Amino acid sequence: MRNLILVGPMGAGKSTIGRLLAKELRLPFKDSDKEIELRTGANIPWIFDKEGEPGFRDREQAMIAELCGTDGVVLATGGGAVMREANRRALHAGGRVVYLHASVEQQVGRTARDRNRPLLRTADPAKTLRDLLEIRDPLYREIADLVVETDERPPRMVVLDILERLQQLPPR
């Protein structure tokens, strides 16, 4: 396996599950958003404010291309990474892709206090999350080797489920 790549909406558990998977597999963990912040010295909301979403997405595309060009990492992507076709191609080619699915209700609960999510600076975050999931869900599924539900499941249980199901996948 080249890399293990986690996609899904914000609040699905990509970073939490990714860190646990990396530890279990003895691989480095990378979060594309955190890598962008490290490189730029700025947080994601600041980048959105100064460069707009297109500017952030350009940075994200470059980071995903770089990280998918490596071998042997567990990679958590930002929720909107799948919006660009170039990213979907890179992610699919970069390794096994696991779509961590979470209901809008779970996403709302998990992101309610997080001020680091520019797209949720709206009057109705639940509606925003619903709208985003409606657009992005087919794109996550398009590139996923596995779809794993995270609602009401402890992270450790999700990790064990992923590891077991990865072993059952045919080579590609």
Swiss-Prot record:
InterPro entries: P-loop_NTPase, Shikimate/glucono_kinase, Shikimate_kinase/TSH1, Shikimate_kinase_CS. Its main location: cytoplasm. The keyword Endoplasmic reticulum does not apply. GO terms for cellular component: cytosol. ATP binds at residues 11-16, 117, 153. It comes from the Bacteria. Binds 1 Mg(2+) ion per subunit. It holds the Pfam family SKI. SUPFAM superfamilies: P-loop containing nucleoside triphosphate hydrolases (SSF52540). Its EC number is 2.7.1.71. Substrate binds at residues 33, 57, 79, 136. Catalyzes the specific phosphorylation of the 3-hydroxyl group of shikimic acid using ATP as a cosubstrate. Monomer. Belongs to the shikimate kinase family. PANTHER family: SHIKIMATE KINASE (PTHR21087), SHIKIMATE KINASE 1, CHLOROPLASTIC (PTHR21087:SF16). This is Shikimate kinase. The lineage of its organism: Bacteria, Pseudomonadati, Pseudomonadota, Gammaproteobacteria, Pseudomonadales. The gene is aroK.
